[in-house]
UniProtKB/Swiss-Prot annotation:
<dbReference type="GO" id="GO:0006096">
    <property type="term" value="P:glycolytic process"/>
</dbReference>
<dbReference type="GO" id="GO:0004459">
    <property type="term" value="F:L-lactate dehydrogenase activity"/>
</dbReference>
<feature type="binding site">
    <location>
        <position position="33"/>
    </location>
    <ligand>
        <name>NAD(+)</name>
    </ligand>
</feature>
<keyword id="KW-0963">Cytoplasm</keyword>
<dbReference type="InterPro" id="IPR022383">
    <property type="entry name" value="Lactate/malate_DH_C"/>
</dbReference>
<comment type="pathway">
    <text>Fermentation; pyruvate fermentation to lactate; (S)-lactate from pyruvate: step 1/1.</text>
</comment>
<feature type="binding site">
    <location>
        <position position="12"/>
    </location>
    <ligand>
        <name>NAD(+)</name>
    </ligand>
</feature>
<feature type="binding site">
    <location>
        <position position="234"/>
    </location>
    <ligand>
        <name>substrate</name>
    </ligand>
</feature>
<dbReference type="InterPro" id="IPR001557">
    <property type="entry name" value="L-lactate/malate_DH"/>
</dbReference>
<dbReference type="InterPro" id="IPR036291">
    <property type="entry name" value="NAD(P)-bd_dom_sf"/>
</dbReference>
<feature type="binding site">
    <location>
        <begin position="126"/>
        <end position="129"/>
    </location>
    <ligand>
        <name>substrate</name>
    </ligand>
</feature>
<protein>
    <recommendedName>
        <fullName>L-lactate dehydrogenase</fullName>
        <ecNumber>1.1.1.27</ecNumber>
    </recommendedName>
</protein>
<dbReference type="GO" id="GO:0005737">
    <property type="term" value="C:cytoplasm"/>
</dbReference>
<keyword id="KW-0520">NAD</keyword>
<feature type="binding site">
    <location>
        <position position="149"/>
    </location>
    <ligand>
        <name>NAD(+)</name>
    </ligand>
</feature>
<feature type="binding site">
    <location>
        <begin position="154"/>
        <end position="157"/>
    </location>
    <ligand>
        <name>substrate</name>
    </ligand>
</feature>
<dbReference type="InterPro" id="IPR001236">
    <property type="entry name" value="Lactate/malate_DH_N"/>
</dbReference>
Length: 323
């Protein structure tokens, strides 16, 4: 069986493992957390859940970094809490988490480098584009074996909102949100389609109101913060996103996903992790064809990319990383 590990056993990490179990992914699961009691509690709970699933030979154990040398997948979900303050205030930009989370990620990266981990690294810890870029620099791991969850959630939310307006299944909505996972995301309406019909045509035919479409971007960006305000954290959606990446990798599905990968020299900020369509299979990821964005969309994409390039450099400086 495959060996799948999660580092950080909070809401996201534990839900990720449960989602894989519910999807029927048989594996030796390892849960790693500084709070070993928390990890042990989840292990016991997951074993109970597995016992009710026939023909599933999965195992669950508390792990250490040394156990991860031969892991196939490691998901890094460790992060500072994103719960609202005592006054009910919620952070409004994922980049606000960088200063604290980069120190946590650096410690984890150095440990995985020490043990010689060679598998796929999945990084949802925010700001995930920056964290993935820092992680690659610190570890020196193959960039194609590092994926940030990127704008996968924004894509899911955009498809959801379009499908609700049109009364169709979200699978019928084609297109990817690209750029930064956060306020710098770009919804390229020029490439979005529903049942192979361009959004522009659907608006012209009166199938969907232009005002509704224009409002989708702000709603997508705010959605996570609304969820955090009401239930203190987001974890169902992001766990499903991580599960999808994991399954594409271990089953060699070669699925095109809108996830954070390292940009090549076709882009203005090459070397950073940023969301573009990528094919995910057993070798990690490879870039899909570059999207043909409108002039306005490309300008927004480039501006956001240059900002992430700067923040990634700032994060590396913060941990004292030198090339």
């Amino acid at each position: 069986m495959k060996k799948i590990a999660v580092i950080g056993c909070g809401f996201v990490g534990s839900t990720y493992i449960l989602d894989l179990l519910q999807q029927g992914v048989q594996a030796d699961y390892l849960l790693v957390d500084k709070n070993t009691n928390l990890a042990d509690g989840h292990v016991r709970d997951l074993r109970d859940s597995k016992s009710l699933k026939s023909h599933n030979g999965s195992t669950f154990n508390v792990g250490t970094y040394d156990d991860l040398k031969d892991a196939d997948v490691v998901a890094i979900t460790a992060s500072i809490p994103t719960v609202p303050t005592a006054d009910g205030e919620v952070f409004t930009d994922r980049l606000q988490l960088m200063t604290a989370n980069v120190k946590i990620l650096n410690e984890i990266a150095l440990e995985l480098k020490r043990v010689g981990f060679k598998g796929l690294s999945i990084i949802p810890t925010n700001p995930c584009d920056v964290m993935a870029g820092v992680y690659q620099k610190v570890t020196g791991f193959d960039p194609h074996k590092i994926i940030s969850t990127g704008c996968q959630l924004e894509t899911m939310r955009t498809r959801k909102m379009i499908s609700e307006a049109l009364g169709v299944n979200s699978d019928s909505v084609e297109g990817f949100v690209v750029g930064e996972h956060g306020s710098g995301a770009i919804v390229p309406w020029s490439v979005f389609r529903v049942g192979n019909v361009p959004m522009k045509q659907l608006i012209a035919e009166g199938k969907i109101k232009e005002e509704y479409v224009k409002d989708i971007f702000s709603r997508v960006v705010k959605e996570a913060f609304e969820i955090i305000k009401f239930k203190k954290a987001t974890y169902f959606g992001i766990a499903e996103s991580m599960s999808l990446i994991t399954r594409a990798y271990i089953y060699n599905l070669n699925t095109v996903l809108g996830v954070g990968v390292q940009l090549d020299d076709k882009y203005v900020a090459s070397g950073i992790y940023f969301t573009v369509p990528a094919v995910v299979g057993k070798h990690g990821w490879k870039l899909h064809s570059k999207l043909q964005l409108s002039q306005e969309e490309q300008a927004a994409f480039d501006k956001s990319a240059l900002n992430i390039q700067k923040v990634t450099k700032d994060a590396l400086d913060l941990i004292g990383f030198k090339n």
